[in-house]
Amino acid sequence: TPANPVHVLQIHGTADETIAYAGADIQGTAYPGAVETVERWAAHNGCAVTGSETGTLDLDRGLAGRESTVTRYTRDCRAGGSAELWSIAEGGHVPELSDHFSKLVVEWLLGHPKP
């Protein structure tokens, strides 16, 4: 874990059978789910660990419509830190990325510079 706050974006399919969205274990070693992981980053960054759903995105062209929910953890964060989860509803481990996926990620990165 870094000493200073950091902006974190996690993108995870809810139907991921390789790394389960809800968490599970690999060969007897437990790992946290997507929400718990992002909440841990939010806590590290001093953010309130209650996220806010702020909209939807179309990240997976193999799924109909704007299937992905954006949850942001930005309240009360220390400078230079935040956490965000893009949950791809019914998305698997390797989504069929939409044509504008790269643009969305680059916009996110540029919008969250390290101070």
Residue ranges of predicted features:
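The feature captures the conserved acid-bearing segment of alpha/beta-hydrolase catalytic domains
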Residues: 1-64, 72-79
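Hydrophobic positions within alpha-helical membrane elements
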Residues: 21, 95-98
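Soluble or luminal CAZymes and related metallo-dependent hydrolases
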Residues: 33, 97-101
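Histidine-bearing beta->alpha loop at or near hydrolase active sites
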Residues: 89-94
